[in-house]
Amino acid sequence: MLWDNPLLFEKLFVEYGLECSRALSTSLGTPYLPACKVLILPTGFANKQYTKTGIGLGRSKHSLEKFVTKGGTLLVFSPLVPEYEYEWLPFSLKYIMEEHSCTPQPVGKHDAQKLIENIDPPLGCDGYFAETDADVVLKDDRGRPIMAVKEIGKGMVVATTIHELPAAGFFECRVACTKKVKV
């Protein structure tokens, strides 16, 4: 998990029986960061009121793309700023902040949708994606993208604006079907 101080979110992984360690975004691409299967950017990563995590992302674009290409899963939650372009991702993605509740509407079927498996609607969202060239796999009640997936090489990037704790099924699936990759 990329973050600069302890988060309640970390306890979720202990509850799921999964290993979780926290790292600074500035450590991406260095020899000090251990290999992992899933790399998570929690909600608020670009909001300076919460963290400095967003600072290291721009210069880490190549490391993140290499991680995904080799088989890693990058799970990205909302930046929690009014508007945000994910310029460090290897695809186009633009976020607009707008808190709302919704019953997510699946678009096709994708393993990433397991992120909300067994979570009763309505779900909280803190925005939507105004544009993307990734595959939209969930939309809100107004038809706006709230989860997008881009498969790159052997891995994938999952970006979502859903503001709920992720379901265990998503991590079980990603841990089972991926290998540890150096970031």
Where are these regions (language model features)?
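Helical hinge/lid and interdomain linker segments adjacent to catalytic or ligand-binding clefts
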Residues: M1-W88
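A structural signal for well-ordered alpha-helical scaffolds and beta->alpha junctions
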Residues: N5-P6, K109, P122, R174, ...
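Short, surface-exposed beta-strand/loop "edge" segments at domain boundaries and coil↔beta transitions
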Residues: F9-E10, R144-I146, P166-F170
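Conserved beta-strand scaffold positions in the cores of enzyme catalytic domains, especially
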Residues: C20-R22, L74, V136-V137, V157-A159
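Short, charged, surface-exposed secondary-structure boundary motifs
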Residues: Y32-A35, Y50-T51, Q105-K109, G169-F170
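Conserved hydrophobic/aromatic beta-strand scaffold that supports enzyme active sites
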Residues: V38, M147-V149, A159
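Extracellular ligand-binding/catalytic regions of CAZymes and related secreted enzymes
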Residues: T73, K94-Y95, G155-M156, T161-V183
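An acidic, glycine-rich "communication" segment
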Residues: F77-G155, E164
